[in-house]
Design a protein with these regions (language model features):
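Nucleotidyltransferase catalytic core that binds NTPs
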Residues: 2-153
Length: 153
């Protein structure tokens, strides 16, 4: 999303969100690609709750603290934050970032677009939130759910 404001004078953050349960190569590619959008800006990972994973998959593989430890150890990640995700969106993570930063670059992976990103309707006209689609590639060649399905067979 473009704006009349100069992106280069703003205090920016790159926000990626997800369950990362378990983390896999697609996640690494996603975070690496997000960092490349603006190497001088911090990458914040909004980490979904255990409750969100239970709603999505029926259970979680790794609990929040363990997932946070793994994601925090990635070289392109500057900070990992919990956020309220009861509504299935990352609106709370975006709002938290907007309290600190002038501009949030909200990255979405290959399986997301403006028609299936719950945050889009709320922020599509907000010059402080820029959406980036297909970060890390436009295919979802791997998913945590598929990895776990293969494991449990």
């Amino acid at each position: 999303q473009g704006s009349n404001h100069s992106d280069y004078t703003m205090n920016r953050v790159i926000l990626v969100t997800g369950g990362f349960d378990p983390i896999h190569g697609g996640h690494i590619k996603y975070i690496r690609a997000a960092k490349k959008i603006d190497p001088d800006s911090p990458v914040c990972v909004g980490l979904n709750s255990d409750e969100w994973l239970i709603r999505k998959k029926g259970k979680y593989f790794m609990n929040f603290d363990e997932r946070k430890e793994v994601v925090s150890g990635m070289k392109d990640v500057d900070v990992v934050i919990p956020f309220i995700d009861k509504d299935g969106s990352a609106n709370d993570a975006i709002d938290m970032c907007l309290q600190i930063y002038d501009l949030v670059i909200f990255c979405n992976g290959g399986d997301r677009g403006d028609n299936n990103t719950p945050e889009y309707d709320r922020y599509k006209d907000d010059y402080r939130v820029h959406f980036r689609w297909k970060v890390g590639g436009d295919d979802k060649h791997n998913s945590s759910s598929e990895i776990l399905k293969r494991w449990y067979i």
